[in-house]
Swiss-Prot record:
Protein name as annotated: Homeobox protein Hox-C12
DNA-binding region: 214-273
Gene (UniProt): HOXC12
Span list, region Disordered: 94-129, 147-214
Reported function: Sequence-specific transcription factor which is part of a developmental regulatory system that provides cells with specific positional identities on the anterior-posterior axis.
Subcellular location: Nucleus
Keywords (A to Z) from UniProt: Developmental protein, DNA-binding, Homeobox, Nucleus, Transcription, Transcription regulation
């Protein structure tokens, strides 16, 4: 056993000039992990208090992150209760004046919404989770404001315009616009082509201004006029100016009417020839 083993790194290293791990770096340290007596020993005491944060004494520090909420919150609340974290403040809401019969409300709707204490009798209406009540709903204040209990028009389901201030804000502006448009101009200045006697239609909207030229009513040719024009066309497709004047005087037509009729008749003949040529190929 005293012979040198060829597989010993301490013996092979100097022979082949290869520095092994134990001979080059740590000559006093072996691969088995044993520590020689010459090396100093370092002691690492175990600390129980690992956390540096100051937690309450009732909760021991165990190395796990602490929750942010002080009180335990159920992740699956029952359906009958609403989550307390999602509750809105009790002071939030919109107010509406009860509007007494004798006194008129001086505040508008926007001012009443901003001021919670609008009046001593202000009633708090809680917010509904379904969204705004009158979303996409347009109320006709002109029809529902003056109707009272007679039911002039159907109001919004949550905020009917029962206050005098709402009536004065909305219906007066709409009614004034209609009266201003009706009384500004002369009723006779706006004439409808379908109803020349009346200036305005049933809905109150004007048809045409007086400056616009109405279209002349179409007057078809009589059989006698068509027969004379067809006979002249068979004689000469392109009528002269002198012959056109003679036809217009004899048939009680204008020169422009005779000219346009001959143009249309030539185009009709051309279409008939093209149709016959197309049918001849088949």
């Amino acid at each position: 056993m005293g012979e040198h083993n060829l597989l010993n790194p301490g013996f092979v290293g100097p022979l082949v000039n290869i520095h092994t791990g134990d001979t080059f770096y740590f000559p006093n340290f072996r691969a088995s992990g044993a520590q020689l007596p010459g090396l100093p020993s370092l002691s690492y005491p175990r600390r129980d208090n690992v956390c540096s944060l100051s937690w309450p004494s009732a909760e021991p520090c165990n190395g796990y992150p602490q929750p942010y909420l002080g009180s335990p919150v159920s992740l699956n609340p029952p359906f009958g209760r609403t989550c307390e974290l999602a509750r809105v403040e009790d002071g939030k809401g919109y107010y509406r004046e009860p509007c007494a019969e004798g006194g008129g409300g001086g505040l508008k709707r926007e001012e009443r919404g901003r001021d919670p204490g609008a009046g001593p009798g202000a009633a708090l209406l809680p917010l509904e989770p379904s969204g705004p009540p009158a979303l996409g709903f347009k109320y006709d204040y002109a029809a529902g404001g003056g109707g009272g209990d007679g039911g002039g028009g159907a109001g919004p389901p949550h905020d009917p315009p029962s206050c005098q201030s709402l009536e004065s804000d909305s219906s007066s502006s709409l009614l004034n616009e209609g009266n201003k448009g009706a009384g500004a101009g002369d009723p006779g200045s706006l004439v409808s082509p379908l109803n020349p006697g009346g200036g305005l239609s049933a809905s109150g909207a004007p048809w045409y201004p007086i400056n616009s030229r109405s279209r002349k009513k179409r007057k078809p040719y009589s059989k006698l006029q068509l027969a004379e024009l067809e006979g002249e066309f068979l004689v000469n497709e392109f009528i002269t100016r002198q012959r056109r004047r003679e036809l217009s005087d004899r048939l009680n037509l204008s020169d422009q009417q005779v000219k346009i009729w001959f143009q249309n008749r030539r185009m009709k003949k051309k279409r008939l020839l093209l149709r016959e040529q197309a049918l001849s190929f088949f």
